[in-house]
Amino acid sequence: PCRSRGLGDVYKRQGEIQVTYFAAGEKVGAFDSFDEVASGNSQAYIGADYYWKGKHPGWAPFTAIPFGLTAGEIDAWVKYAGGQELWDELAGSFGLKNFAMGNTGVQMGGWFNKEINSAEDLQGLKMRIPGLGGDVLAKLGGSPISVPGGQIYENLVSGAIDATEWVGPYNDYFMKFYEAAKYYYYPGMH
């Protein structure tokens, strides 16, 4: 997320853990934090695992499952039904250890520069949507585009993308998407 500084060097001093945070782009690019930590150059990142599904498709379900488990159900699966063990196995194969750090809950469908009335309206739509939600959009004829959070607004304004999902009204307000796109839809595909 753009307001949470996602990459940190952690070190121990006098029995305390101190963390130095770097926002996306300060040390590495927004989509480079996984490799930065997996390589040992940094000790932790905060991010959504669906961004790493290109490295292994197993990452995506730990963030969102379109029209599947709710955020609370994913949390319960991770904590009580074997999800953490699967996550540990997957992350371990990359030299990582993952922890649930919270979630944003049910998300909106997103901001669109054109009206959507049917699935046909998604044909050719360039939308910033990661993870399995992007796979759903592609199956419906749209084009999922990867754009870091801090670049979404400018991409909407320039027309590089036609639509974006982010989080929900509160978070989206601070991103000022209402200035860049006319239509706001619910529910989300992720």
PLM region descriptions:
Residues 18-43, 71:
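Extracytoplasmic small-molecule ligand-binding "clamshell" domains
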Residues 158:
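Short terminal or interdomain "cap/linker" segment that borders an active site or interface and mediates
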Residues 35, 43, 48-144, 149, ...:
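Contiguous mixed-secondary-structure segments that line small-molecule binding/active-site clefts
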Residues 49, 168-169:
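Short secondary-structure boundary segments
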Residues 1-7, 11:
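Single conserved hydrophobic/aromatic residue that forms the stacking wall/gate
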Residues 12-16:
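Short helix-capping segments at alpha-helix termini
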